[in-house]
Design a protein with these regions (language model features):
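Phosphate-group recognition and catalysis centered on beta-loop-alpha active-site segments
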Residues: 1-312
Length: 312
């Protein structure tokens, strides 16, 4: 079980124990806790994972949007490797199906934006795609020029045991085996407890549940209007952050579902979403996401302790 120090502080604060000696004892206890947390942080820092301890404070997860796409070409192995180094909780990625049935990781159904080739993914074989330059559009660095479009299997082979996945299915009439292919790879790599399959296409989510009801699904919405909360075959909602308020968060949680918000690249907005209690922040910059999560909960802890100790 996780220890949520902020919750302990809040619970004790509510009891309002006012005896001066008791307050001093509590202050000493919390000082010891803060000292222990700082020691834990420094130990983790030596392991090159300075954000590992964030989960002690918060349930809000960080999802690296198309990998760490702030610093590397989106949906490439380099972006995914950087997301792992940033200790993101999830990688959010997009999948399409090639003409010969290979599942590749790319956002657009057309290759032009990231490779310069003006052709649809589903009209090309994997052999025609695998050597395309998928990184030079991002910058002139040699490491970018080496980036290629990976297969989902290649990604899973690398990420298994390192990070969880949010796999967004971009379904079209020209990709008949995409859903089944994704489900098969989740089964092959035993990823069902470590991933969400998300889509704007509700049909894709129902098909995933028909194949394996234990695979968690997320419905992607641009807005938070209407009676969408009780939709079947959906375990989470992924919604544009500009439509999120506390009522939306509470309504979704009341129905036992998760809430992911996208795409947030400034710390102030990220901290605001964390304060509302969203379950995951999707961001191009996972380091910022981790910092925002930690900052919000460390501020809350300090405020609770100071309020309790020094209140008249």
């Amino acid at each position: 079980n996780k220890l949520y120090i902020g919750e302990i502080a809040e619970d004790i604060t509510e009891k309002r124990i006012r005896h001066p000696l008791t307050q001093k004892v509590i202050a000493i206890i919390f000082s010891a806790i803060l000292f222990t947390v700082n020691i834990f942080y420094m130990v983790k820092a030596f392991d090159n994972n300075p954000f590992n301890y964030v989960e002690m404070f918060s349930d809000t997860l960080t999802m690296a949007h198309r990998g760490s796409s702030y610093e590397a070409p989106e949906n490439t192995m380099l972006a995914f490797e950087n997301a792992v180094k940033a200790t993101a909780d999830y990688i959010e990625l997009d999948v399409h199906e090639t003409k010969d049935g290979e599942i590749v990781v790319i956002h657009d159904d057309n290759l032009k934006r990231t490779t310069g080739v003006n052709k649809k993914v589903y009209n090309m074989t994997y052999d025609e795609i695998k050597d395309l330059d998928a990184g030079s559009y991002f910058g002139d660095e040699e490491e970018f020029k080496k980036c290629r479009i990976p297969t989902l299997e290649e990604v899973m082979s690398y990420t298994k045991g390192k990070i969880k996945l949010n796999i967004e299915i971009k379904l079209s009439a020209y990709e008949p085996d995409l859903v089944e292919g994704v489900a098969a790879l989740i089964e092959k790599y035993d990823y069902k407890d470590e991933c969400y399959v998300t889509s704007m296409n509700y049909k894709a989510l129902t098909e995933i549940k028909e194949i394996n009801e234990e695979i968690k699904t997320g419905y992607i919405l641009y807005s938070a209007y209407g009676n969408y909360y009780n939709i079947d075959n959906v375990d989470a909602f992924s919604i544009n952050f500009s439509y999120i308020n506390k009522n939306v968060v509470d309504a979704i949680h009341y129905r036992g579902k998760q809430l992911f918000v996208w795409t947030i690249n400034d710390r102030k907005t990220a901290e605001k979403m964390v304060a509302m209690g969203v379950d995951a922040v999707i961001t191009d910059n996972p380091v910022m996401g981790k910092e925002a999560t930690y900052a919000r909960y460390s501020y809350s802890l300090i405020e609770n302790v100071l309020s309790y100790v020094f209140e008249d």
